[in-house]
Each structure stands twice: as C-alpha cells, then as structure tokens.
Amino acid sequence: MIQQETFLTVADNSGAKKLQCIRVLGSNRRYAHVGDVIVAAVKDALPNMGVKKSDVVKAVVVRTKATLRRETGNSIRFDDNAAVLINEDKNPRGTRVFGPVARELRERNFTKIVSLAPEVI
C-alpha cells in the first residue's frame, strides 16, 4: 500500500530514480495499490534527462511490497515499491520498463506499460 510520504523506486528510463508520493489520485483516497495513479515528487534523478529533482510528476504504481490478492485466490508480493512515470495521456514518459509488472495494469488500460515490461506476473 502506498500513501503520502512513501518513497518509491522508478521502474523506467525517464531519468528519475526515487519518488516520494504526494497524493493518491481519486476521491479522498488514502492508499494506492497496483495500477493506481499517484502524484509524486522526484527525490533523485540522473543529470541531463527529462526530469529533474523536485519536479512534480504523475506516476502509476507497478509493484508493491504489500500482498496483492487476486480473484482466483492467488496472492503475489514484490520486493520493492515501484512506479512508472506517465504523461497526461497515461502513456509512459520513458521508453523502457525495468523489472516485472503486475497483470492488473492491463485491466486498468495501461497496455503500453505492459507491452514494454520484460515480464508480466
């Protein structure tokens, strides 16, 4: 579960390395899960890339440490909290996605992120 002040790693090559969640988008929501959109501040970034430190960006959560339960009864859990930066059209800002992503992203219409990911769990 991601909430305000949570630090996340960035799972794409947009230039950002660490994010801090500012807000979970939605009507008065406290927690974000896989597939939810958050507003975050860039805390660490590579030089000469598309984003800079202290930029405010939108991102979609692709991995969480909290257990994710599926309707089939399966549950999965990742080793880190990670997000992918997106633009206003909900397309990824980077051209590559690193690490596995959850299948729930396809149901939330983030098909571009799913197609860029090396593994879908």
From Swiss-Prot:
Keywords: Ribonucleoprotein, Ribosomal protein, RNA-binding, rRNA-binding
Gene Ontology MF annotations: large ribosomal subunit rRNA binding; structural constituent of ribosome
GO biological process, one term: translation
Keyword Transport recorded: no
Entry's Gene Ontology cellular component terms: cytosolic large ribosomal subunit
Protein's job: Binds to 23S rRNA. Forms part of two intersubunit bridges in the 70S ribosome.
PANTHER family: 50S/60S RIBOSOMAL PROTEIN L14/L23 (PTHR11761), LARGE RIBOSOMAL SUBUNIT PROTEIN UL14M (PTHR11761:SF3)
Subunit structure: Part of the 50S ribosomal subunit. Forms a cluster with proteins L3 and L19. In the 70S ribosome, L14 and L19 interact and together make contacts with the 16S rRNA in bridges B5 and B8.
Protein name as catalogued: Large ribosomal subunit protein uL14
Species this protein is from: Prochlorococcus marinus (strain MIT 9211)
High-level lineage: Bacteria, Bacillati, Cyanobacteriota, Cyanophyceae, Synechococcales
